[in-house]
Regions:
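NUDIX/MutT-family hydrolases
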Residues: 82-86, 92-125
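Glycine-rich phosphate-binding active-site loops on the catalytic face of alpha/beta enzymes
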Residues: 206-215, 244-256, 281-306
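Conserved Nudix-box catalytic region and its N-terminal flanking loop in Nudix hydrolases
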Residues: 15-55, 66-67, 185
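Alpha-helix-loop-beta-strand connector modules within alpha/beta enzyme cores
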Residues: 171-190, 207-210, 215-228, 257-283
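Active-site mouth loops of central-metabolism enzymes
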Residues: 127-142, 221-226
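Conserved, mostly hydrophobic/aromatic
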Residues: 131, 158, 195, 235, ...
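Active-site-adjacent beta-strand/loop module that shapes the phosphate/pyrophosphate-binding cleft
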Residues: 11, 69-91
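Conserved N-terminal beta-strand and adjoining loop/helix that marks the start
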Residues: 1-16, 68
Length: 306
C-alpha cells in the first residue's frame, strides 16, 4: 500500500486549493489535492509539509489531521491521509508545472477529478457546526426565533432532536424547521419514517439503532451518535456519511459523567475515513481545538442557540 499525505488548503473565504496533474505523471490532466508520498521514517504531517514546500512553495502554520481513506487504483492501492491547512507562509504557485485553482467545495468547476477525491469533496460539504435543537428547554417559539438568527449567522446543518414531543407535534415542528432552513441541511434524530415523510435531508441514528443496522438508511446524509471505537467502526462499515462522538467534556445534560477528553477523542478518531463531530460541553469557540484533535467540527446543543 502506498501511503500519501494530502492537504485540504482553505482560503479565508472557505475555498479549497486544487492542482492539475502535469504530463509525465499518472493521470495527467486530473485535478487533486496537493500532497505526495510519505517517505520511510517520515510522519504523514512532516511529509505533507515537505510536499507543500516542494510542490507549491508554502510552509503550513496551521495544519491539523482530518480523515484517512484507502482507495484502489488499477496500478496501486493508496492510503490518503488528509490534513486541514488553514494558515501558511508564502504564496501558492505551481512549482512542478501544475496548474492551481481555488474552488468552492460546494461547487467545484474544474474537471476531471482524481476518483479518490470525489468522496473527500462530499465530506467537505458538511459544515463545521452541527446545531441540535433544544425546544424542550427553550420552547418552540423561542427555539424557532433563535434558529432564524442562527441561520442568518451562518448555521447550515441542523439536527431535530426532541425526545419529549409527541409525534404530531414533532412533525409540525420539523416542517417549520424545514421551511425556515431552506438553505440548510436538516436531519431528524432516530425517526426514519418521519424523516422520509417530511423529506428531510438526513437521518441521525442513535448508537443503539446503529449497532442493530445492517444497511445504511436511504438518505442524502446519514450520521450516528457514537461513544467509542467499536461504534465508530460500525458507522464506517455501514458507509455512513459522518459520526458524532462524545461526550468530550463534562456536560449538564449528563451530570456525574466525566467526559472522554480531547486526547481520547483524538486517539479514537485517528485514521477514521468519515468526518467526526465532537459533542459534549462545547462552545462555539471550541471549534479550533476540536479540529486540532482531528474533528471535522463540533455538535452544539445549548451553545448553538446563544
Amino acid at each position: 500500500m502506498v501511503e500519501v499525505a494530502a492537504g485540504v488548503i482553505f482560503s479565508e473565504k472557505g475555498d479549497i486549493l486544487l492542482g492539475k496533474r502535469p504530463e509525465g505523471k499518472p493521470y495527467p490532466g486530473y485535478w487533486e489535492f496537493p500532497g505526495g508520498k510519505i517517505e520511510a521514517g517520515e510522519s504523514a504531517m512532516d511529509a505533507l509539509k515537505r510536499e507543500l514546500k516542494e510542490e507549491i512553495g508554502i510552509t503550513p502554520r496551521n495544519i491539523h489531521p482530518w480523515i484517512s481513506r484507502v482507495f484502489h487504483y488499477s496500478h496501486a492501492t493508496v492510503k490518503l491521509n488528509f490534513f486541514r491547512v488553514t494558515g501558511w507562509d508564502g504564496e501558492p504557485k505551481g512549482l512542478e508545472n501544475q496548474e492551481l485553482s481555488w474552488q468552492n467545495p460546494n461547487e467545484v468547476k474544474v474537471s476531471p477529478l482524481l476518483p479518490a477525491n470525489e468522496p473527500i469533496l462530499r465530506s467537505l460539504r458538511l459544515p463545521p457546526v452541527y446545531a441540535v435543537t433544544n425546544a424542550a428547554r427553550l420552547g418552540i417559539a423561542l427555539q424557532l426565533e433563535k434558529m432564524r438568527a442562527a441561520l442568518e449567522n451562518g448555521v447550515e446543518f441542523i439536527q431535530i432532536r426532541e425526545k419529549e414531543m409527541d409525534r404530531d407535534a414533532l412533525k409540525r415542528f420539523a416542517l417549520e424547521v424545514m421551511a425556515l432552513g431552506k438553505n440548510a441541511k436538516v436531519a431528524i434524530n432516530s425517526d426514519v419514517e418521519l424523516a422520509h415523510q417530511i423529506k428531510a435531508h438526513g437521518i441521525h441514528l442513535s448508537s443503539n439503532q446503529l449497532m442493530h443496522l445492517s444497511v445504511k438508511p436511504d438518505f442524502d446524509w446519514c450520521g450516528a451518535s457514537v461513544h467509542d471505537a467499536r461504534e465508530l467502526d460500525k458507522a464506517v462499515s455501514l458507509g455512513l456519511d459522518f459520526a458524532v462522538m462524545g461526550h468530550v467534556l463534562a456536560t449538564p445534560s449528563h451530570p456525574g459523567m466525566e467526559g472522554m477528553g480531547w486526547e481520547r477523542f483524538s486517539a479514537t478518531v485517528k485514521g477514521c475515513p468519515i468526518p467526526v463531530y465532537a459533542l459534549g460541553g462545547l462552545q462555539k469557540e471550541d471549534l479550533r481545538i476540536a479540529q486540532q484533535h482531528g474533528a471535522h467540527g463540533i455538535a452544539l446543543l445549548s451553545a448553538a442557540w446563544k
